[in-house]
Amino acid sequence: MIELFVIKETEWLELVTESVSLEGQRYQAPRSITAKIITKQGTHSYYSVSEGDTVLFKWKGKELFRGIVFSRNPEEHWMTFTAYDMLQYLVKNKDVYVFSNQRADEIIKRLARDFQIPTTSIANTGYTIKSLVFKDDTSLYDMILKALKQTKSQTGRNYQLYSAKGKLGLRAWPDLSEVWVLETGVNITGYQYSTSINDTATKVKLRRQKDNKTYTATASDSSGISKYGVLQYVETVSDNINQAQLQERAKVKQAQKKGVKKELKSIQAIGIPDLQSGLPIYISIPEVGVKKTYWIDTDKHEFKGSTHTMTIDVVEKNSIPDGVSS
């Protein structure tokens, strides 16, 4: 059952709640809830919330979220509000910084200290970053992601920012040793699955201009050409690379763009409270030949009365998306 509280200095006040939506996205801080509460019934008024209040959400006695109210939509008898966890302060705050000879965890602690963000356990990331400079105003979140990205490139280890009981933390990314299973006929209630060759390339051509000369490199998928015809992808490369590197890049690009593209999304299922973006999940949908482990990219949990449902999107690899702190 839903338990939603507003936390005051000396007490927790329970809110009369109709529904709660809890959601998050991998590498997109923070997690949030949107709740609909009853504030008035007849002549009787119930507890409400204001911007800046701390709210706590429990489901069947287990805390799933604690965060700060950032927006409200009050009506005559009810109110909808949205609250964010502590990672919101990493997104909202920007500044310029120069870090020298510091680990990613030390950078996190410094930023948290400077911006008065309470912390819980911060894992030692091990690798010392020689220099990290942000000359333009940059969000604290992007600074940290860049530090974590450099750490992964040097150590191969992934780390995850999280918020627990109103405090910012850092932990090693959960591994694949134990995963939840979603399966049609058991707990999956719906999904969208599609296949397409709209973005497939059976031939890749890369060009590079240098000293008024054009250098080209090509790679092709002969079996793909036989099956789908010639579908050529062309790109002009601006990097300062030699012919051998250009050819290697063409081969890599061809490998990325070959074959039928398969997309699995909007997986609807019976709710599992522990599932959230960034976690591994094994999905079995024999009807379309899917039996493998994915990573949860987005999650949205809906709670109403005694019912809990969820919708997730998944990705095959837990890599930092292009354009994120690159």
Swiss-Prot record:
What is the protein name given in its UniProt record?
Uncharacterized protein YqbQ
The record, for InterPro entries, names: Bact_Kbp, YQBQ-like_dom
Family, according to the entry, reads as follows: To B.subtilis XkdQ.
Please name one Pfam family that this protein belongs to. YQBQ
Q: Which PANTHER family match?
A: PHAGE-LIKE ELEMENT PBSX PROTEIN XKDQ, POTASSIUM BINDING PROTEIN KBP
Q: Which domain of life is it from?
A: Bacteria
Task: Provide the taxonomic classification.
Answer: Bacteria, Bacillati, Bacillota, Bacilli, Bacillales
